Amino acid sequence: MNIDIVCVGKVKERYLRDAIDEYRKRLSRFAKVDVIEVADEKTPEHASDTLNAQIKEKEGERILKHLRDGAFVVALAIEGDQLTSEQLAARIAQWGLHGVSHLQFVIGGSLGLDPRVLRRANMPLSFSKMTFPHQLMRVILLEQIYRAFKINAHEPYHK
């Protein structure tokens, strides 16, 4: 299976880049995982709703350029479905059984995702009602994908 993490902005902190690299390495025996970063827009501290919508639209255009025809797209969004690790593992297994060979997870920028990206997604997924830094969310997502593959392989890791 091919998995892309399509995300807005670059990870600046070395410890987060190291964690991302570690989980990509661990996942390499299960899937080919690519992290695709699109440029983020500068967001003024007290931006108007109109400006925020324009920023999300620009970032959304960049994301949409990387979403592949035929890929199953999962958009991380606070209003998405909340799953346990076991449920995510079951979904990934089910998608594979139904012929999904390319899975794309989308992580928006600090303002979230443009509505067009959410409409393109096959499934919205929420990790929590809380807000997480989008750079950290990459690590959390990769860890959960790794955990899902370990669960599906009946290998020790998940407790």
Swiss-Prot record:
GO CC aspect terms: cytoplasm
Pfam short name (any one): SPOUT_MTase
Annotated compartments: Cytoplasm
Residues binding S-adenosyl-L-methionine: L76, G108, F127, S128, K129, M130, T131, F132
Annotated EC: 2.1.1.177
Molecular function GO terms recorded: rRNA (pseudouridine-N3-)-methyltransferase activity
Stretches of the chain forming a coiled coil according to its record: none
Top EC category: transferase
InterPro entries listed in its UniProt record: Alpha/beta_knot_MTases, RlmH-like, tRNA_m1G_MTases_N
Top-level taxon in the UniProt lineage: Bacteria
Record keywords: Cytoplasm, Methyltransferase, rRNA processing, S-adenosyl-L-methionine, Transferase
Reaction catalyzed: pseudouridine(1915) in 23S rRNA + S-adenosyl-L-methionine = N(3)-methylpseudouridine(1915) in 23S rRNA + S-adenosyl-L-homocysteine + H(+)
SUPFAM superfamilies in UniProt: alpha/beta knot (SSF75217)
Protein family membership: Belongs to the RNA methyltransferase RlmH family.
NCBIfam families, A to Z: PRK00103.1-3 (NF000985), tRNA_RlmH_YbeA (TIGR00246)
PANTHER family in the cross-refs: METHYLTRANSFERASE, RIBOSOMAL RNA LARGE SUBUNIT METHYLTRANSFERASE H
Assembly with partners or alone: Homodimer.
Annotated function: Specifically methylates the pseudouridine at position 1915 (m3Psi1915) in 23S rRNA.
Protein name: Ribosomal RNA large subunit methyltransferase H
The species this protein was found in: Bifidobacterium animalis subsp. lactis (strain AD011)
